[in-house]
């Protein structure tokens, strides 16, 4: 990406999609991911000065397929001070790519080939950074769909919906061929603006898609279950949600500090205490194996998303 006074990031896929099935999570959230990343970057710009060297992008283009989606995206980002830096284009992907210095590919998985097939699109994408957050679609698949992979700079990343609050756990796949350091820096900076970044080998990508991309939904189910229990015993729903969410956030901070979830478990569960009785109830319900299995199923499903494209 050339350094100039104005740099533009185009986000291809900003649909506001809601969950229907946990197994469909990785694909169904892609449009929402594009909006989440854009929202998080806009929020991060509020912490930067006008001459901040870390500010890689000054303008943004959000590409959508429906007017109502564009209106929803506009509403979602309206609270940001830099919302006026975002241009929303309806059914104008090519225009968005042409005026961009880098592209975030965040459409639903089954749409990427049709997007590349748009007249002039492959030429417009040449030599530009293409950051893909498509679950299950490998770099090799993307390069093959583009044509000559050597003409494109494609890198995979999997953030999660917490980009909205700049607390995502994002995994970035280490490029397997020579990749410009400047473009790696751009990718790193984009995702550090919305949370934490981890670099992984391609072999671990589908696992991390489930662990980082899907698990916020699993954790939300866990919180919701705790809320149900508290409400059943008389606590108000709002208080229960706030307390359960804050408790999970605090527990996560403790795990990050200690590096071992078992440390927290043993610190809280005293012999003969109420916490130990609650833990035994969880074990009787096979919660540990159920959660582990959910993660493995999600990882397998994420891999299938890419496999279906080659069927």
From Swiss-Prot:
<dbReference type="InterPro" id="IPR029036">
    <property type="entry name" value="P5CR_dimer"/>
</dbReference>
<dbReference type="InterPro" id="IPR008927">
    <property type="entry name" value="6-PGluconate_DH-like_C_sf"/>
</dbReference>
<keyword id="KW-0560">Oxidoreductase</keyword>
<dbReference type="GO" id="GO:0055129">
    <property type="term" value="P:L-proline biosynthetic process"/>
</dbReference>
<dbReference type="InterPro" id="IPR053790">
    <property type="entry name" value="P5CR-like_CS"/>
</dbReference>
<keyword id="KW-0045">Antibiotic biosynthesis</keyword>
<keyword id="KW-0521">NADP</keyword>
<protein>
    <recommendedName>
        <fullName>Delta-1-pyrroline-5-carboxylate reductase kk1I</fullName>
        <ecNumber>1.5.1.-</ecNumber>
    </recommendedName>
</protein>
<keyword id="KW-0325">Glycoprotein</keyword>
<keyword id="KW-0732">Signal</keyword>
<dbReference type="InterPro" id="IPR028939">
    <property type="entry name" value="P5C_Rdtase_cat_N"/>
</dbReference>
<dbReference type="InterPro" id="IPR036291">
    <property type="entry name" value="NAD(P)-bd_dom_sf"/>
</dbReference>
<feature type="signal peptide">
    <location>
        <begin position="1"/>
        <end position="31"/>
    </location>
</feature>
<feature type="glycosylation site" description="N-linked (GlcNAc...) asparagine">
    <location>
        <position position="59"/>
    </location>
</feature>
<comment type="function">
    <text>Delta-1-pyrroline-5-carboxylate reductase; part of the gene cluster that mediates the biosynthesis of KK-1, a novel cyclic depsipeptide with 10 residues which is a promising active compound with high activity against many plant pathogens, especially Botrytis cinerea. Within the pathway, kk1I catalyzes the synthesis of the L-pipecolic acid residue of KK-1 from delta-1-pyrroline-5-carboxylate (P5C), a metabolic intermediate of lysine.</text>
</comment>
<dbReference type="Pfam" id="PF14748">
    <property type="entry name" value="P5CR_dimer"/>
</dbReference>
<dbReference type="InterPro" id="IPR000304">
    <property type="entry name" value="Pyrroline-COOH_reductase"/>
</dbReference>
<dbReference type="GO" id="GO:0004735">
    <property type="term" value="F:pyrroline-5-carboxylate reductase activity"/>
</dbReference>
<dbReference type="GO" id="GO:0017000">
    <property type="term" value="P:antibiotic biosynthetic process"/>
</dbReference>
<comment type="pathway">
    <text>Secondary metabolite biosynthesis.</text>
</comment>
<dbReference type="Pfam" id="PF03807">
    <property type="entry name" value="F420_oxidored"/>
</dbReference>
<comment type="similarity">
    <text>Belongs to the pyrroline-5-carboxylate reductase family.</text>
</comment>
């Amino acid at each position: 990406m050339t350094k100039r006074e104005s740099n533009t990031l185009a986000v291809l896929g900003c649909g506001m999609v809601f969950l229907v099935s946990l197994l469909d999570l990785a694909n169904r959230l892609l449009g929402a991911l594009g909006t989440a990343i854009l929202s998080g970057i806009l929020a991060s710009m509020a912490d930067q000065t006008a001459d901040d060297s870390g500010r890689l992008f000054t303008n943004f283009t959000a590409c959508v397929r429906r007017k109502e989606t564009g209106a929803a995206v506009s509403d979602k980002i309206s609270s940001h001070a830099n919302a006026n830096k975002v241009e929303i284009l309806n059914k104008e992907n090519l225009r968005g790519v042409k005026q961009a210095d880098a592209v975030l590919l965040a459409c639903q998985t089954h749409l990427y080939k049709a997007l590349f097939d748009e007249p002039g699109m492959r030429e417009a994408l040449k030599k530009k950074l293409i950051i893909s957050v498509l679950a299950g679609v490998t770099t090799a698949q993307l390069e093959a769909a583009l044509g000559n992979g050597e003409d494109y700079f494609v890198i995979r990343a999997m953030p999660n919906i917490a980009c909205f609050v700049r607390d995502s756990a994002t995994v970035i796949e280490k490029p397997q061929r020579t990749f410009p350091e400047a473009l790696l820096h751009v990718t790193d900076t984009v995702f550090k603006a919305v949370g934490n970044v981890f670099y992984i080998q391609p072999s671990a990508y589908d696992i991390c898609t489930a662990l980082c991309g899907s698990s916020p939904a699993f954790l939300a189910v866990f919180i919701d279950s705790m809320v149900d229990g508290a409400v059943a015993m008389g606590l108000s729903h709002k208080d229960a949600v706030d307390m359960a969410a804050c408790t999970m956030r605090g527990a996560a901070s403790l795990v990050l500090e200690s590096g071992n979830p078992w440390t927290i478990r043993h610190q809280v569960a005293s012999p003969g205490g109420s916490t130990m009785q609650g833990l035994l109830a969880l074990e009787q319900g096979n919660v540990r194996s159920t959660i582990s299995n959910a993660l493995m199923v999600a990882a397998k499903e994420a891999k299938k998303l890419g496999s279906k494209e080659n069927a």
